[in-house]
Each structure stands twice: as structure tokens, then as C-alpha cells.
């Protein structure tokens, strides 16, 4: 009875992971060997505030969930923590900022963006991009610049005519 309950729990966990992995735009796998529980909880709290999920998953269960989701086959060995979410930039920034603070105990091992394997260097490059909100602000600034310059020009023309 106990083993049957454990098996059912594992099946439910894999189904849940499969669903969440399928919906995620980004998935990063990190080695957390030697990281204290307190520090891992701090990472979870930062991630939760950004809508990012963090979970330590048994490699065999993660492998099954990833395979059934269609993610490329990854070599899952040793201790792994999985981080996933919809914002690739926010997830990359979170991982690399945390990795800077905990160099010896937290290392990015693999990454998947839109179900495609990406290198650690690619994830690092993405982490250096402006956030989604900053990019939208830049774009809005570019869009409104012509109107701003036009209004400024009209105002300068009005002031010049008033002086004459």
C-alpha cells in the first residue's frame, strides 16, 4: 500500500512538472552542491517575487517530465535545482546574480529557451540585457521622440515670434 501511494505521488509530480515545463518559456538547471537550505530559500523568495518557480527535483523524475514535454535530452547528474518561468531575461538575471554571490556552491549547468538548448554563454548574454520593462520604456521613448521634438520646435518657434 505504501509503495503504491509513493508511485502515485511520483506519477502526479511528473504530470505536474510536465504541465509546468510545457508552459515555461525558459528553464535553467543549476548545480547547488554545498548551498545551505537558508540560501536556497532566499533564492526561492527572490524567484517567487518575479513569478519564477524553483524546485529541487529527483533527476529520474525530472528526466521523465522533460522527455515527455519534448525538451531535448539533458544529462542530469549530481545535485540539480530547476528554475523556470516565462521571462527569459528575468530568469537569466536571477541565476547569474545569485551565482555571483555563491560562486562555489551555485553553477548554471544547462539552459533551455523555448524548448531549445542554449549554452551557458548565451544565458549569460541574455542576463546582461535590459529587463522587459526597461526595453518597453526605451521603445516608448523612441516612438514618442518625433512628437516631442515637434512640440519643442513649435514652442521654440512661438517664443521666437513673441520676441520679435
Curated annotation (Swiss-Prot):
GO CC terms, sorted: large ribosomal subunit
Molecular function via GO: large ribosomal subunit rRNA binding; structural constituent of ribosome
CDD domains in alphabetical order: Ribosomal_L10
Any Gene Ontology biological process: translation
Sorted UniProt keywords: Ribonucleoprotein, Ribosomal protein, RNA-binding, rRNA-binding
KW rRNA-binding (keyword) present: yes
Keyword Transcription regulation recorded: no
PROSITE patterns, sorted: RIBOSOMAL_L10
A Pfam family that the UniProt record links to this protein: Ribosomal_L10
Assembly and binders: Part of the ribosomal stalk of the 50S ribosomal subunit. The N-terminus interacts with L11 and the large rRNA to form the base of the stalk. The C-terminus forms an elongated spine to which L12 dimers bind in a sequential fashion forming a multimeric L10(L12)X complex.
Role this protein plays: Forms part of the ribosomal stalk, playing a central role in the interaction of the ribosome with GTP-bound translation factors.
Family according to the record: Belongs to the universal ribosomal protein uL10 family.
The protein's name in its UniProt record: Large ribosomal subunit protein uL10
Species per Swiss-Prot/TrEMBL record: Helicobacter pylori (strain HPAG1)
